[in-house]
């Protein structure tokens, strides 16, 4: 074992290093990722000792500054039995989450293709999309804002062809934009939204919601109100449909005819005076009143005070026709 690896003797034949040469203040994040092209993250101390013993006659370690959960390192293993020294270089292919302790594949990020992360909270129906700016921007247009159409909601107006938003495959025209880069869009003007996207950097994180998911309950309520409106009308038609009804139907409600005098009843004018409210109510021909509008002779005789019943009333009516 080379003395450069440490200066403390190990009773089992090795030397326990007290620090790396050339590193005056080693940091905790200066970790070795691989030894002899083998990962160290899931190995125990006894396994590390065995690997060091199998490394050869000389072991040289060169650390690099930590930039992630597992730092990259260049490891050189020299053995007198080998003609030349072997240099093993490794760059981290995975990214480790320090808080969760899980391994996740890194997202490929290019300039021409958007990389996005989709999260769908089932409770709220919202989802988030992360886009990367391309040569022509993010590839979407927005509409709405506080000064547009009286505080209209901010929505996705359209997607540019072959843009990052269209290649994402998650966005649709009409989606409601609730958050931009973690900040709510409520109360923002259209100019403020554009400025926030422009100054947000090469990445854009949007939290959206489908209109049908948000307005499902509202549509049910509106349908319930419409049903109530139809039940109020005894004919089963909508209140708005009354504007299309012929004006003849409104005449019996708006026009009131004076009560006929007894003389008019005697000469038969009462039929023509009461005929008008019944016109076109059930597609009847005007001038043909229903049977309930023709008074009986007994009622007419009692109303006019004519004695003798129907015979005397017929004589009076005949005399009236002759006079007129």
Swiss-Prot record:
Region (Disordered): 1-26, 216-263
CDD domains from the UniProt entry: PDZ5_MAGI-1_3-like (cd06735)
Keyword flag Disulfide bond: no
Compositional bias of kind Basic and acidic residues: 216-241
Domain PDZ: 128-212
Chain positions with Phosphoserine modification: 261
PANTHER family: PDZ DOMAIN-CONTAINING PROTEIN MAGIX
Protein name: PDZ domain-containing protein MAGIX
């Amino acid at each position: 074992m080379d003395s450069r690896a440490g200066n403390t003797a190990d009773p089992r034949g090795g030397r326990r290093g007290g620090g790396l040469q050339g590193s005056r203040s080693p940091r905790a994040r200066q970790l070795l990722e691989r030894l002899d092209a083998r990962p160290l993250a899931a190995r125990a101390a006894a396994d590390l000792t065995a690997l060091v013993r199998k490394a050869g006659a000389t072991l040289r370690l060169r650390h690099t500054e930590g930039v992630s959960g597992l730092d990259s390192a260049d490891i050189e293993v020299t053995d007198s039995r080998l003609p030349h020294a072997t240099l093993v270089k490794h760059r981290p292919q995975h990214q480790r989450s320090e808080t969760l302790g899980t391994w996740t594949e890194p997202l490929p990020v290019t300039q021409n293709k958007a990389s996005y992360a989709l999260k769908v909270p089932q409770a709220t129906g919202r989802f988030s999309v992360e886009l990367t700016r391309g040569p022509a921007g993010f590839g979407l247009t927005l509409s709405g804002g506080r000064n547009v159409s009286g505080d209209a909601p901010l929505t996705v107006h359209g997607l540019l062809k072959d843009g990052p938003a269209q290649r994402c495959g998650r966005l649709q025209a009409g989606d409601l934009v609730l958050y931009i880069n973690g900040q709510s869009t409520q109360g923002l003007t259209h100019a403020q939204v554009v400025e926030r996207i422009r100054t947000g950097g090469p990445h854009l994180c949007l939290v959206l919601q489908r209109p049908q998911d948000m307005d499902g309950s509202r549509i049910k309520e509106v349908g319930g109100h419409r049903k109530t409106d139809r039940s109020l009308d005894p004919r089963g038609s909508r209140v708005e449909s009354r504007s299309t009804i012929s004006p003849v139907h409104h005449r019996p409600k708006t026009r009131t005819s004076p009560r006929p005098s007894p003389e008019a009843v005697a000469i038969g004018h009462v039929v023509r005076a009461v005929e008008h409210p019944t016109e076109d109510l059930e597609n009847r021909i005007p001038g043909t009143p229903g049977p309930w509008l023709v008074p009986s002779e007994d009622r007419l005789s009692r109303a006019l005070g004519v004695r003798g019943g129907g015979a005397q009333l017929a004589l009076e009516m005949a005399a009236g026709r002759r006079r007129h």
